[in-house]
Amino acid sequence: MRLIVVSIMVTLLSGCGSIISRTIPGQGHGNQYYPGVQWDVRDSAWRYVTILDLPFSLVFDTLLLPIDIHHGPYE
């Protein structure tokens, strides 16, 4: 049961830092490349979730890198 709950949490939280840094105003902090990873590392109050989210944010940010190059810094 615990494994199922953890699996669901990881799936729902995957790439959370990437989504937050791109969509919520003020959370990008001027980062253009890998804003989700930088958001996770910077000052996340959810340190235990950051450990789970960081690899997913890294993959998600890498997939969105071509878009980030043309978009410019996220504010």
Curated annotation (Swiss-Prot):
Residues 1-21 form the signal peptide. The keyword Signal applies. The keyword Chloroplast does not apply. Keywords: Signal. It holds the Pfam family DUF1375. Disulfide bonds: none annotated. One of its GO terms (biological process) is DNA damage response. NCBIfam families: PRK10175.1. To E.coli YidQ. This is Uncharacterized protein YceK. The gene is yceK.
